[in-house]
Amino acid sequence: MSEKRKSNKIIGIDLGTTNSCVSVMEGGQPKVIASSEGTRTTPSIVAFKGSETLVGIPAKRQAVTNPEKTLASTKRFIGRKFSEVESEIKTVPYKVAPNSKGDAVFEVENKLYTPEEIGAQILMKMKETAEAYLGETVTEAVITVPAYFNDSQRASTKDAGRIAGLDVKRIIPEPTAAALAYGIDKEGDKKIAVFDLGGGTFDISILEIGDGVFEVLSTNGDTHLGGDDFDEVIINWMLGEFKKQEGIDLSKDNMALQRLKDAAEKAKIELSGVSSTEINQPFITIDANGPKHLALTLTRAQFEHLASSLIERTKQPCAQALKDAKLSASDIDDVLLVGGMSRMPAVQAVVKEIFGKEPNKGVNPDEVVAIGAAIQGGVLGGEVKDVLLLDVIPLSLGIETLGGVMTPLVERNTTIPTQKKQIFSTAADNQPAVTIVVLQGERPMAKDNKEIGRFDLTDIPPAPRGHPQIEVTFDIDANGILHVSAKDAASGREQKIRIEASSGLKEEEIQQMIRDAELNKEEDKKRREASDIKNEADGMIFRAEKAIKDYQDKIPADLVKEIEEQIEKVRQAVKEDASTTAIKAASDELSARMQKIGEAMQAQSASAANAQGGPNINSEDLKKHSFSTRPPAGDNSSSTDNIEDADVEIVDKPE
């Protein structure tokens, strides 16, 4: 079979906490691509079941029976230290552990997986979805991230794309992508707010659009606020109600919790359209008196009360974003709603309260981000003309200076790409070296901000305190990823650092993970093909036994015996885990035997027609029991080994 030709398309991927979506420019218009399951969004879930790695809908379907090996909402852990995710760990059934560098990783069957690896599995699924639609190999993508993602989270997302075999041309914030999708065909100047409440994060961005220029004026948000948190308040309510009714605490039962998670998500969605919903979970647990059932009614008013503190948390970031943009709510022409949680009536009411106007509901909150990413892909690929995107950094960047002070070099909401330089000096006489501690955040003291990297500038010539001239340069690229350098004017000595993902994956390790992913892809494909052949064999046995039962009195006894013997051969081949070739051969032989049923029945039908003047066998039944089709083998990529390394890559460049 010939290789697919390489596509010149740059696809757009919304890598979401709960769901992901892929889009591509086609004929000058963005198109959302449906998955192999026929859905326009794919659950951002990866599961490990035996030797198989499941992604998307298949992973979600088995989550209740396999909670500890089903990884959902992993985006909340990407680019973060274990010490930063205590609250998130409490909400997931799988094991989150620190690796040797203190990064948050997932432990499944004594194997560690980084959030980048799991993200890569989802991105591979999106890549394959696009390739199946285009009929070409896709190698380039624009991937979206929450606007309030910090530098290491952005770098981690880019690494996930590379592991998935994608050249990530640009990382852009989700609200910015949504604004692109909204404003690409709009005329005139407008100031818009994008209110993005997704599965795991909340972002608010203020933009000015006009004449093809999309300028982000400010951005703010909360990376710990999203649909998962709304699910959690319903789960806690259900746990409390069930404990009151039955005296049983379900909070330590992972299988029950996964069922409650699914029920909470379903109830949350339903309550956006109805005033109350029934939650029924039969046989949720069992005690000495027998099985117990959970049956509750949750009203919209109750849910809004339970979630009131979460909804309230969206107000302050909106106020800050308006303040940073030097605008009032009345200056905003339109408010876009993005993310599944923006469908909640109480959320929409708060948006109206904040901005003093009804929000725009003309975009699909589940798809608009992927559409915007595809448009940006079109801009980068030259397919979309006369569009300029001016983005900003969400948090200030600086270094630690004397007294443990955070000295910003680049203020938040600075348009990127950008470069800033500042001269620093030593704090002691004859100081031979300085440590450059790179920080991100808004607090005045260094310890209260996030350290995203550090490096040493050594061999500074002896000089009195304050005399050496050390030029520190911050260079931020269009992806919002930071490069820092420090140069001593006297010696010409310079050191540089690229702020890496906190997982600390080195370049060669990323390349190894890419190679591993490709190797595992072929192995997993073989496993999937073997699984499909076994499933088809089981189906063939079922159809053959049903055909014998239905038509035993219409076919010769020796044929019945022949088929029963072949059924047993197929069953034994499957049971003994024979080779796929042997199972397929036995199944094909059974299929041939089953065709004899049709031939025998047709002969009997013809004989009856001659004797009685007409047929007496239903032709649809003949088709149903005489033929089988083998579905095409699927494809699924297994995960790569966990790799750990230092937080940053240091390059010495002495002059």
UniProtKB/Swiss-Prot annotation:
Disulfide cysteine pairs (residue numbers): none
Alphabetized Gene3D superfamilies for the sequence: 1.20.1270.10, 3.30.420.40, Actin, Chain A, domain 4, Substrate Binding Domain Of DNAk, Chain A, domain 1
UniProt-listed InterPro entries: ATPase_NBD, Chaperone_DnaK, Heat_shock_70_CS, HSP70_C_sf, HSP70_peptide-bd_sf, Hsp_70_fam
Low complexity biased stretches: 600-612
Phosphothreonine: modified positions: 201
GO molecular function: ATP binding; ATP-dependent protein folding chaperone; unfolded protein binding
Keyword hit for Transport: no
Statement: the UniProt record of this protein carries the keyword Lyase: no
Keywords assigned by UniProt, alphabetized: ATP-binding, Chaperone, Nucleotide-binding, Phosphoprotein, Stress response
Residue ranges, annotated region (Disordered): 598-655
Induction and repression of expression: By stress conditions e.g. heat shock.
Domain of life of the organism encoding this protein: Bacteria
Coiled-coil blocks: none
Function: Acts as a chaperone.
Family, as annotated: Belongs to the heat shock protein 70 family.
Note: Expressed early during infection.
Protein name (database record): Chaperone protein DnaK
